[in-house]
């Protein structure tokens, strides 16, 4: 068993080193070769992630309660639970892994906006993708899906372009956000089917 762990260790170390090199190389390309005229737009949109991810589900919950619409209330509850799950997972990983921000480690990265907590995973990206996925599952219409995912993708890109996240941070944020929304959609769907 000891040999197994040593073998895994000696295989993983070079892979992690390579992954870190690929991560910073891609970030360097995105950050240093960005169209700086887009910086104000990207700074603006990046800061919509958290507020929109929390306000939209809560607003739907209020509307559903006022209208006494059980179907809408159920969708809103799934969204609220999805967002909370994604936030808990992301925050736990951030402070467990405690990865420094790219601009803290690499002086050539241009930091264009704020980034305070640890880098991995991207909380803004998680927020954007949990909401985009939950909205798309709740209201599967093109006029909802396309804008939701364009918004989420713009936020994900902005985190790298503005120099505050590595591509791996963003990718894992996408996976956590999408995964949380899918998980709770499946759980609630299976519960509804078992009652039928």
What residue spans do the PLM features occupy?
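N-terminal transmembrane-helix/juxtamembrane module of multi-pass inner/ER membrane proteins
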Residues: 2-57, 90-117
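Alpha-helical transmembrane segments of integral membrane proteins
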Residues: 5-6, 73-82, 144-147, 168-172
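Alpha-helical transmembrane spans of integral membrane proteins, capturing the lipid-embedded, hydrophobic core
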Residues: 8-11, 79, 83-87, 174, ...
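Structural signal for the C-terminal ends of transmembrane alpha-helices
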Residues: 18, 61-71, 137-140, 183-189
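Interfacial segments of alpha-helical transmembrane regions
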Residues: 60-89
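Transmembrane helix-loop junctions in multipass membrane proteins, especially transporters and channels
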Residues: 66-69, 95-103, 164-168, 189-194
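Membrane-embedded catalytic cores of phosphoryl/pyrophosphoryl-handling enzymes
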Residues: 108-196
